[in-house]
């Protein structure tokens, strides 16, 4: 794998540090008036998603991580693993609950997802930015009941709970932003 100098760190670069893959989120090169230049780098730990800030000397380097993002189609969940398929080679890949995490509530059959692989194993699953789901349970919206915040909780077909406007009813299909978990619009 390639070795990168701290001067080469850019957003999106994936490096190995302490035996784990990290993604560079931002890098600021600092050249003080006195002393050695350094890079102040914000990193995201790919295995857990936690953020770390680290300072690298200008002479430091890091090995590139063998991390690949693949567009795969979600097939099904067998109770233990979530199964995905590569549309070009038709190979199937199984991701465990640790890799899928909270994104399980946004996975629909045949949805195109981005699966991040490290050493051939899935470490994270990113669902599509927007999904269309049916409302299976919500309180009825009463006419003129706008004294509150103007929203009510609704349970969707995947089990996710989203705050929706008062006019939305059971059985309607809504569009949800998976990054924030917020209601976007009704689907006609």
Swiss-Prot record:
It is found in: Cytoplasm. SMART domains: EFP, Elong-fact-P_C. GO terms for molecular function: translation elongation factor activity. The keyword Cytoplasm applies. The modification N6-(3,6-diaminohexanoyl)-5-hydroxylysine is found at residue 34. PROSITE patterns: EFP (PS01275). GO terms for cellular component: cytosol. One of its GO terms (biological process) is peptide biosynthetic process. Keywords: Cytoplasm, Elongation factor, Hydroxylation, Protein biosynthesis. Pathway: Protein biosynthesis; polypeptide chain elongation. May be beta-lysylated on the epsilon-amino group of Lys-34 by the combined action of EpmA and EpmB, and then hydroxylated on the C5 position of the same residue by EpmC (if this protein is present). Lysylation is critical for the stimulatory effect of EF-P on peptide-bond formation. The lysylation moiety may extend toward the peptidyltransferase center and stabilize the terminal 3-CCA end of the tRNA. Hydroxylation of the C5 position on Lys-34 may allow additional potential stabilizing hydrogen-bond interactions with the P-tRNA. Its main location: cytoplasm. It comes from the Bacteria. CDD domains: S1_EF-P_repeat_1, S1_EF-P_repeat_2. Gene3D superfamilies: 2.30.30.30, Nucleic acid-binding proteins. Involved in peptide bond synthesis. Alleviates ribosome stalling that occurs when 3 or more consecutive Pro residues or the sequence PPG is present in a protein, possibly by augmenting the peptidyl transferase activity of the ribosome. Modification of Lys-34 is required for alleviation. NCBIfam families: efp (TIGR00038), PRK00529.1 (NF001810). Belongs to the elongation factor P family. This is Elongation factor P. It comes from Cronobacter sakazakii (strain ATCC BAA-894) (Enterobacter sakazakii).
């Amino acid at each position: 794998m390639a070795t990168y100098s701290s001067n080469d760190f850019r957003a999106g670069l994936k490096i190995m540090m302490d035996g784990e893959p990290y993604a560079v989120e931002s890098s600021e090169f600092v050249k003080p008036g006195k002393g050695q230049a350094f890079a102040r780098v914000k990193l995201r730990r790919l295995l857990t998603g936690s953020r770390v800030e680290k300072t690298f000397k200008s002479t430091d380097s890091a090995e590139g991580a063998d991390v690949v993002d693949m567009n795969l189609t979600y097939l099904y969940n067998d109770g233990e693993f979530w199964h995905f398929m590569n549309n070009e080679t038709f190979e199937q890949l199984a991701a465990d609950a640790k890799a899928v995490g909270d994104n399980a509530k946004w996975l629909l059959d045949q949805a195109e997802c981005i699966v991040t692989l490290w050493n051939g194993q899935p470490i994270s699953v990113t669902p599509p930015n927007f999904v269309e789901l049916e409302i299976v349970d919500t309180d009825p919206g009463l006419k003129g009941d706008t004294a509150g915040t103007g929203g009510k909780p609704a349970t969707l077909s995947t089990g996710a709970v989203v705050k929706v406007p008062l006019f939305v009813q059971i059985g309607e299909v809504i569009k949800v932003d998976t990054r924030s978990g917020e209601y976007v619009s009704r689907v006609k």
